[in-house]
Amino acid sequence: MAHKKAGGSSRNGRDSAGRRLGVKKFGGQDVIGGNIIVRQRGTKVYPGVNVGMGKDHTLFATADGRVRFHDGKLGRKYVSVDMMAEAAE
């Protein structure tokens, strides 16, 4: 005979790993073309000048420059990359 009554099993106790979303390059930081600026679910931030959007809504720089976040129409947030003047050689 069993000396202990069988315990019930819990249906909780598991979780998924975080998805590492968020801003990767902040306003004022320099970027080169192809750098990821924001990883997001849906369009929390929209692409502005010199910024592209991937199929998973990731925003990335399409040119070298400096990141700038700004507000646009309809209360949307935008991120642009301002190209810097080329250094005189």
From Swiss-Prot:
One of its GO terms (molecular function) is structural constituent of ribosome. InterPro entries: Ribosomal_bL27 (IPR001684), Ribosomal_bL27_CS (IPR018261). HAMAP family: Ribosomal_bL27. The keyword Magnesium does not apply. Belongs to the bacterial ribosomal protein bL27 family. The keyword Ribonucleoprotein applies. This is Large ribosomal subunit protein bL27. Keywords: Ribonucleoprotein, Ribosomal protein. Gene3D superfamilies: 2.40.50.100. SUPFAM superfamilies: Ribosomal L27 protein-like. GO terms for cellular component: cytosolic large ribosomal subunit. Residues 1-22 are annotated as: Disordered. GO terms for biological process: translation.
